[in-house]
């Protein structure tokens, strides 16, 4: 029986603890595989975040790329959106970002980008994995090695971003970059856009001394309090690589991811791409101004569907947004500026958020051994709808999403990183949400055993 090779790529590139899953050896092999895949020809742009292991990994990565014949353009310590932008702007064969995004300091990772700034698709990642497992690297002779150059793309990126936004009136904005890769760039762009900026955690530091890189409410108490105490119009927080952003309204409250996505969808209109776990409020807020199309969870799937549908905007309910008029790479800095643009034109964010309907939601997980996930999900697809008498639609593009006649819904998906089956649901009322949760969890506990 042929041995099954382990998957190296997860839902967002290769990611894990440095020295354990993410090692110098794996990084070098990964880069050799990329350069081999590219035929030992072309330019690869490389950036990294503020983590203590990032420059070390960059050195291993560059060595592997050059050894197999590709040229390297070093961007330095930059946020992920700048890597995607540089890949498309410079006509590179690929882009590489060394980052673990929102994960804690001991973690690091590698994510790949296409020439149009879109993340590598799963099919492309499997090709890289196959080359790594086979060790069929196409090394070059001493006189065919790639070259290494360093380019500063920050000014170019700043100019390009500012051309796409217009802050109609000056705003006071508090920016918490979390000591990540946007620590200098995000405040700089906001100032150039005409905002008065107060910064928190704006010193690049891979130990993340100010807060955890994950921009969730429990990590943003200082930002929320600063917005309140300074009378700011808006608060912005980024994760470690700034492919995401979150917003704090003018009352110092965390802005719901789904509601913020809904507001931006309404503002832009047309075809809007989001994921199967996004709230019904996105559909209701957009109304007849456009169409919501749902796809699999993950920014690469959102990007692919944007390209296929010719959509004007797409995003996940995690603060990961894509703006195809600029670049197909998720961009937390541009997203934050467009929220500021919305506030400057439409009024206080707290009032705008009140215009978006709220529905009770529940997120839960049920223990399930990894080896049982496939068979359990087959049963879920065939049987879960029987738990409800008013099913209107079943979507199996990513897990199983069941919509009920009143718009309530439940999504069941296997975790890609933990031994759990995850439940996400939304009910039109608290009672309906509890009912859906009880029926779904009870069913899963019964079939998992």
Curated annotation (Swiss-Prot):
Enzyme Commission code(s) on record: 5.4.2.10
Key words of the record: Isomerase, Magnesium, Metal-binding, Phosphoprotein
GO-annotated molecular function: magnesium ion binding; phosphoglucosamine mutase activity
As given in the record, the signal peptide range reads none
Please name the GO terms of the biological process aspect recorded for this protein, alphabetically: carbohydrate metabolic process
Write down the chemical reaction(s) this protein catalyses: alpha-D-glucosamine 1-phosphate = D-glucosamine 6-phosphate
**Family annotation (InterPro entries):** A-D-PHexomutase_a/b/a-I, A-D-PHexomutase_a/b/a-I/II/III, A-D-PHexomutase_a/b/a-II, A-D-PHexomutase_a/b/a-III, A-D-PHexomutase_C, A-D-PHexomutase_C_sf, A-D-PHexomutase_CS, Alpha-D-phosphohexomutase_SF
Q: Where does Mg(2+) bind?
A: 101, 239, 241, 243
Instruction: Report which superkingdom the organism of origin falls in.
Output: Archaea
Query: Which PROSITE patterns does the record associate with it?
Result: PGM_PMM
Q: Which cofactor does it need?
A: Mg(2+)
Task: List residues modified as Phosphoserine.
Answer: 101
Respond yes or no to whether keyword Phosphoprotein is given for this record.
yes
Q: How is it modified after translation?
A: Activated by phosphorylation.
Q: What enzyme category does the UniProt record give?
A: isomerase
Q: Which residues form the active site?
A: 101 (phosphoserine intermediate)
What does the entry's cofactor note say about binding and number?
Binds 1 Mg(2+) ion per subunit.
Known function: Catalyzes the conversion of glucosamine-6-phosphate to glucosamine-1-phosphate.
- Family, per entry: Belongs to the phosphohexose mutase family.
Give the protein name, as stated in the record: Probable phosphoglucosamine mutase
């Amino acid at each position: 029986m042929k041995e099954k090779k382990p998957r190296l790529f997860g839902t967002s590139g290769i990611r894990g603890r440095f020295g354990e899953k993410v090692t110098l050896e794996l990084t070098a092999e990964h880069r050799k595989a990329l350069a081999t895949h590219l035929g030992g020809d072309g330019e690869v742009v490389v950036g990294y975040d503020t983590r203590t292991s990032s420059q070390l990994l960059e050195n291993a990565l560059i060595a592997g790329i050059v050894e197999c014949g590709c040229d390297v353009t070093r961007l330095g310590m930059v946020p992920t959106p700048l890597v995607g932008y540089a890949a498309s702007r410079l006509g590179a064969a690929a882009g590489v970002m060394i980052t673990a995004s929102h994960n804690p300091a001991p973690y690091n990772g590698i994510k790949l980008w296409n020439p149009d700034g879109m993340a590598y698709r799963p099919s492309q990642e499997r090709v890289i994995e196959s080359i790594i497992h086979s060790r069929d690297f196409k090394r070059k002779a001493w006189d065919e090695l790639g070259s290494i150059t360093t380019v500063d793309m920050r000014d170019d990126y700043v100019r390009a971003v500012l051309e796409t936004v217009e802050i109609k009136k000056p705003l006071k904005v508090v920016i918490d970059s979390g000591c990540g890769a946007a620590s200098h760039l995000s405040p700089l762009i906001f100032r150039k856009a005409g905002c008065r900026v107060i910064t928190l955690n704006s010193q690049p530091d891979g130990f993340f001394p100010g807060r955890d890189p994950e921009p969730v409410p429990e990590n943003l108490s200082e930002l929320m309090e600063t917005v309140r105490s300074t009378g700011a119009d808006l608060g912005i927080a980024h994760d470690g690589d700034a492919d995401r952003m979150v917003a704090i309204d003018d009352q110092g409250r965390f802005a719901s991811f789904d509601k913020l996505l809904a507001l931006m969808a309404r503002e832009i209109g047309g075809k809007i791409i989001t994921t199967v776990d996004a709230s019904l409020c996105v559909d209701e807020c957009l109304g007849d101004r456009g169409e919501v199309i749902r796809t699999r969870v993950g920014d690469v799937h959102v990007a692919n569907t944007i390209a296929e549908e010719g959509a004007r905007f797409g995003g996940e309910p995690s603060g990961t947004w894509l703006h195809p008029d600029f670049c197909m790479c998720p961009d937390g800095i541009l997203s934050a500026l467009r929220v500021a643009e919305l506030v400057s034109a439409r009024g206080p964010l707290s009032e705008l958020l009140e215009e978006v309907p709220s529905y009770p939601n529940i997120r839960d997980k049920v223990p399930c051994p990894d080896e049982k996930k496939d068979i359990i999900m087959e049963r879920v697809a065939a049987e879960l709808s029987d738990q409800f008498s008013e099913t209107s639609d079943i979507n199996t593009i990513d897990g199983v999403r069941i919509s009920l006649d009143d718009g309530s819904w439940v999504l069941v998906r296997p975790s890609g990183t933990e031994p759990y089956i995850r439940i996400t649901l939304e009910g039109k009322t608290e009672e309906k949400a509890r009912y859906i949760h009880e029926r779904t969890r009870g069913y899963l506990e019964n079939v998992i055993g």
